[in-house]
């Protein structure tokens, strides 16, 4: 995890911030770089050497139609498996580079990242071996997120961990892609050619953590690739990394944290719980102290620093806030919580849920701000001492407002989630306005100006059921479009108090309308990838066509954890 103790310098002058801000905004006019394909390297224990690319190409021509051939597709034909072992590594550097934690003080060019990957892999493997021996680990989970944000994993015996780090872990592609809903059997897609193929889970070793709530087990978060070494274009984590790279190319870095609501029930209380609830009640926060202490302590040991927790507004509902971190770490923390909270709950014979059957939806707020690449200057902070965003902040906010309809499709991905947008209205509407304000928790986009470190935008469009990687990626994509746009806030001076909107933005209440908005949003389609948008829309349309209202709550209760 990154040490963000020195995120900002209080003595940075306003003039310096404005001058650097202008130069960074100018970078946004450049053509976006293409994301390069991952490269292959090889390892012999702790000694890492570059593999001959032609040899690797020949090794990758195994007949995948034969049973069992996929598991050994690139090394059975190698001359010496100990000296020439292929490793699939992503070429994305900086905040999302495999085996490289984000350091805002480092020049993260693609060439530098590639040259650093090999020695870092050796160093991390040595450290991980020591951790495994110290904790007497028996298993390591190789985890990846599917489109729903559900963790899909394979557990590997500890003695095979290094081999799987080098070779990768194979998993059917259908597990992570077009799943109509998490409870459907994957064999429904057996006739689709792409679902008969395997993908490769390649671990990002910086995410290796011992799981306190699992017996002698660790986990590592993985990036997903095809068997030929191509990034899986539907991978939410890959999409988030790609957007963070685009943000860095523009001269900025993302500091963010998720705020999650979740509900805890005893098994008999799952339906129609009568639990009394008072927001931030000390008595309710301490109602089951051992459970919350184990959860928070466990999250800390997995690298997710919890800033606070409290009771929330609904029966049995708790709120948990993470500390802000740079790069992909905030989404990794949220991904860890989604699985960890239920695993800890089961130890206490509880059920943890992000959405429950009574119809209200837990929120998944992304609190974020944009900093310079060095991580020392908050580009949203005006320094005026009043509730005001900089020009960069106004343009970023304008982008979120502009794309709010499409964003809501990704951030409230189920019918129940969309009910929260009109919970205070009794009128039947097709859409509601996208609201924003300063220090107003009722708004969809809440701007908080609490000093330099605390000047941020809370994106409250999100439901806790949404995939955190998609929430982060879509937020960055919309914000970047706002920075590039010459409309709205771009026409204002930095001293203006009001954010000009050419057209009022609306959030559709029906899932069908939200899907249409996403399909029509050319900016998000380009940023997130047409392949991903096509898969996501197809999945949601299938759900709508086969919707079982009575079962929806149970689906979320059991799987969206």
Swiss-Prot record:
Start-end of Basic residues biased regions: 26-37
Domain GS catalytic: start-end pairs: 236-561
Pfam families assigned to the protein according to its UniProt record, in alphabetical order: Gln-synt_C (PF00120)
GO molecular function terms listed in the Swiss-Prot or TrEMBL record: catalytic activity
Biased composition regions of type Polar residues, renumbered to the chain: 50-63
Intrachain disulfide bonds: none
Tissue: Expressed in lens.
SMART domains given in the database record: Gln-synt_C
Domain of life the protein comes from: Eukaryota
All copies of domain GS beta-grasp, residue ranges: 135-229
Alphabetized InterPro entries for the sequence: Gln_synt_N, Gln_synt_N_sf, Gln_synth/guanido_kin_cat_dom, Gln_synth_cat_dom
Gene Ontology cellular-component terms listed: cytoplasm; membrane; plasma membrane
Annotated family: Belongs to the glutamine synthetase family.
Role this protein plays: May act as a component of the cytoskeleton or as a chaperone for the reorganization of intermediate filament proteins during terminal differentiation in the lens. Does not seem to have enzymatic activity.
Assembly and oligomerization: Dodecamer. Interacts with BFSP2 and VIM.
Protein name: Lengsin
Native source organism of the sequence: Rattus norvegicus
